[in-house]
């Protein structure tokens, strides 16, 4: 289908650096775009902490690793450091290893210092509740690998699940699950579960690809994360939603901006009446 093109370019540098100002006159689409971009940037840092700290945990002794029950998460403290915690949860949190990760350089150092034990319990409970709901939604036959991201605010804990990079080299999109829990993780208070179908690509640096969400009138968090996380694997990535085609452009100093093309179907031409 051909479309009349209307272009809107929005800088996302302010989002990347944690500012929350929205462009004047923005509509609901743009508002959600800025919110989801901010979340995706936090996910990128969370994922980086996972990578650098997981390398360190491989160096632990067999005795130490025997206490690891699969509960891993990280949180950012008031000093701007990430705490990556690996352990097990069974009504209480048992720590296997605790790493401090610099939020700028992502340098990793193991620490035997204190950590937020209450938060560790709440994060573990939140993860277990959200994981159970995710598995119920996707069903027992689903075997796709997912990454999880856990964030907190003063009033809630949010657990996000996005498809991970798969062992067969495919980068997958088409499903994402987001759960908001009470601050003590005693219950799920809001749910956003999206599944269309799993679709994906392998790395093609010279090809422009499209990730398609034509059933949505907004750009989901998973689409933003996919573009930011895998942008070097392709020439360009386009996000196609109901009303927009969106991509990322970079200006001076590699500053990113969203490039939105409004999808407006052209008016059909009236057929000329033939003379009798």
Task: List PLM regions with ranges.
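Bacterial Sec-dependent N-terminal signal peptides
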Residues: 1-25
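Start-of-domain marker
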Residues: 19-82
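Exposed beta-strand-loop-beta-strand "reactive/processing" segments of non-cytosolic proteins
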Residues: 59-98, 134-175
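Hydrophobic alpha-helical segments and helix pairs
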Residues: 85-135
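Short helix-loop boundary/capping segments
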Residues: 164-200
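Short HxH-centered metal-ligating active-site micro-motif
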Residues: 186-221
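Hydrophilic extracytoplasmic domains
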Residues: 217-276
